């Protein structure tokens, strides 16, 4: 095993093998424990894209809320699933299939296009130009603004979908989809997440669909693996302590080092990870 590989595995808490049912229970109990400790909270809010990660996080959250209602008799415990399209979403059917699978208590829809376009126009008013990539990050951050607005109106906390295969590459928007209150998938790689969806009875297309952030107008539905330059299979193998090609390992480690700032709170004078 490569020296940095061992360090990364330890930092992200990845196990080489898992029991999916045990990990489902672990995440559900985690979500319930947070509510029991913070009794002022009654809802969890999650943006739903129609991909594997939000499908899994949503299913775990709904299960936690069902158990909270059963255990406390308090029907105020609700899971709010939020659709956050930029205009019309090409894979809207997948998003609705995910919502149907998870049986969300409440479903909301917020079209982020007007607010994103307004922000782009405001910044460009001085003659500067927002790149398509930068605009994609604005979309991700606007989605989180909407989720926190909904959570604020409903005594809620926001659920994030970050997992080990994203964390190692930093493949999320800082203070966008990377900004949340709880991340119940943290510690799981991509194939492990799919295994949890299988035991939860998810339709296969929800975890077999090619992962995409789908943030760029000029490159719609760009596969994550194309953007990263490495396959999720290699990322998962690396995180599980297996041998991968030097090229794959070097690509993963390059992303890990480049995106270290994303895995930290704002940097203070006491931090030295970046030096």
Curated annotation (Swiss-Prot):
EC number(s) from the headed UniProt entry: 6.3.1.5
Residues where ATP binds: 47-54, 161, 190, 212
Biological process annotations from GO: NAD biosynthetic process
Residues that, per the record, bind Mg(2+): 53, 166
GO MF term list: ATP binding; glutaminase activity; metal ion binding; NAD+ synthase (glutamine-hydrolyzing) activity; NAD+ synthase activity
Catalytic activity reported: deamido-NAD(+) + NH4(+) + ATP = AMP + diphosphate + NAD(+) + H(+)
GO cellular component: cytoplasm
Pfam families named among the record's database cross-references: NAD_synthase (PF02540)
Binding site for deamido-NAD(+): 141, 174, 181, 261-262
Keywords for this protein: ATP-binding, Ligase, Magnesium, Metal-binding, NAD, Nucleotide-binding
Superkingdom: Bacteria
Pathway this chain belongs to: Cofactor biosynthesis; NAD(+) biosynthesis; NAD(+) from deamido-NAD(+) (ammonia route): step 1/1
NCBIfam families linked to this entry: nadE, PRK00768.1
HAMAP family linked to this entry: NadE_ammonia_dep
Family, similarity comment: Belongs to the NAD synthetase family.
Subunit text: Homodimer.
Matching PANTHER family: NH 3 /GLUTAMINE-DEPENDENT NAD + SYNTHETASE (PTHR23090), NH(3)-DEPENDENT NAD(+) SYNTHETASE (PTHR23090:SF7)
Function (record text): Catalyzes the ATP-dependent amidation of deamido-NAD to form NAD. Uses ammonia as a nitrogen source.
Name of the molecule in the record: NH(3)-dependent NAD(+) synthetase
Lineage of the species this protein comes from: Bacteria, Bacillati, Bacillota, Bacilli, Lactobacillales
């Amino acid at each position: 095993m490569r020296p940095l590989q061992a360090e990364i595995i330890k930092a992200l808490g990845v196990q080489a093998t898992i029991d999916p049912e045990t990990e489902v229970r672990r995440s559900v109990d985690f979500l319930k424990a947070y509510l029991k400790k913070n009794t002022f909270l009654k809802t969890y809010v999650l943006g739903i894209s129609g991909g594997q990660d939000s499908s899994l996080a949503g299913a775990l959250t709904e299960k936690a809320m069902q158990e909270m209602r059963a255990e406390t008799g308090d029907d105020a415990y609700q899971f709010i699933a939020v659709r956050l399209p930029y205009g019309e979403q090409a894979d809207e059917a997948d998003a609705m299939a995910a919502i149907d699978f998870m049986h969300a208590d409440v479903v909301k829809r917020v079209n982020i296009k007007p607010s994103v376009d307004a922000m782009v126009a405001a910044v460009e008013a001085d003659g500067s130009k927002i790149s398509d990539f930068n605009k994609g990050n604005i979309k991700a951050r606007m989605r989180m603004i909407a989720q926190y607005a909904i959570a604020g109106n409903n005594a809620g906390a926001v659920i994030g979908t970050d997992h080990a295969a994203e964390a190692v590459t930093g493949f999320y928007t800082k203070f966008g989809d990377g900004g949340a209150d709880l991340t119940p998938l943290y510690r799981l790689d991509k194939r492990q997440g799919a295994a949890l969806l299988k035991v939860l009875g998810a339709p296969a297309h929800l975890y077999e669909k090619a992962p995409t952030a789908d943030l760029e107008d000029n490159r719609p539905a760009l596969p994550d693996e194309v953007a990263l330059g490495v396959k999720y299979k290699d990322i998962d193998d690396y995180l599980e302590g297996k041998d991968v090609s030097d090229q794959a390992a070097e690509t993963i480690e390059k992303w890990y080092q480049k995106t270290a700032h994303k895995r930290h709170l704002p940097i203070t004078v006491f931090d030295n990870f970046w030096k």
